[in-house]
Amino acid sequence: MMKKPVVIGLAVVVLAAVVAGGYWWYQSRQDNGLTLYGNVDIRTVNLSFRVGGRVESLAVDEGDAIKAGQVLGELDHKPYEIALMQAKAGVSVAQAQYDLMLAGYRDEEIAQAAAAVKQAQAAYDYAQNFYNRQQGLWKSRTISANDLENARSSRDQAQATLKSAQDKLRQYRSGNREQDIAQAKASLEQAQAQLAQAELNLQDSTLIAPSDGTLLTRAVEPGTVLNEGGTVFTVSLTRPVWVRAYVDERNLDQAQPGRKVLLYTDGRPDKPYHGQIGFVSPTAEFTPKTVETPDLRTDLVYRLRIVVTDADDALRQGMPVTVQFGNEAGHE
């Protein structure tokens, strides 16, 4: 009977030991934190003019710091200014034609067309009567067959002129056809699109910095004739500053987006930077050879992007960084 309390006591002791051990493991995991190794991400961009032309001027040189919106260089604007003037003239012509189509014909134009019909009708009547007389003369052998044919030809020509005048008067009275108006509108829209393209081309003959950065290389000099898209500068982007690191699957649960971390560099080991995980790769990959821990290079890991929230100029691209997880880093 004494064995039962002993067994229960031992079970309680074992359970307490398991709970205490688990709590100690959890605390040690939280207190000691996870340490990863990475590098400040290298981000560069090749800058180029979207249009081609002769380089007129370049405002920066290698090593210069640039700001977003800063003018970096310009092409010769003259060809694009001329093209813009031509496009504006094209819009004016197309607009005038479209307005005429919408307005239709004036009363004066209709009256002139009606007068032309009367004149053509009189000419036709005369030609028809003359032809009739010539037929009688030909039957009596007074004129030749050639004279009769000339009279017929004059009659037919007068008839065609009359029909053309009648068609024109009919068109003037009924106004322009919907198809003609639609065609004039399409021509106007095409001219407006060409104008917009000309304005964009002139704008793109000036090279503007897309973001803050440092100029790494200058590939051309003033006077160079470039094709569209030809590289002019290579720029290292300085903001925002990202750290690239890798975590294995066993510790993936600690590296969640929004998690805050501390970032240490060799130059300031006692004054860490602060960062926040912004991205965790959804797919595993083999650790790159650049990782400082050789024993992890053959493991499958997940790439992290850590945004440095208090970066300064001392944090250079490619610099090795130690990433420290822990309670002092905190959570979002």
UniProtKB/Swiss-Prot annotation:
Q: Which residue positions does the secretion signal occupy?
A: 1-16
Taxonomically, which superkingdom? Bacteria
Chief localization: periplasm
- Any one annotated GO CC term: periplasmic space
Q: Does the keyword Coiled coil apply?
A: yes
Keywords recorded for this protein, A-Z: Coiled coil, Periplasm, Signal
Q: Which residues form a coiled coil?
A: 108-209
Q: Where in the cell is it found?
A: Periplasm
The family annotation for this protein states: Belongs to the UPF0194 family.
What PANTHER family does the entry give? EFFLUX SYSTEM COMPONENT YKNX-RELATED, UPF0194 MEMBRANE PROTEIN YBHG
UniProt-listed HAMAP family: UPF0194
Q: What is this protein called?
A: UPF0194 membrane protein YbhG
Organism whose genome encodes this protein: Escherichia coli (strain 55989 / EAEC)
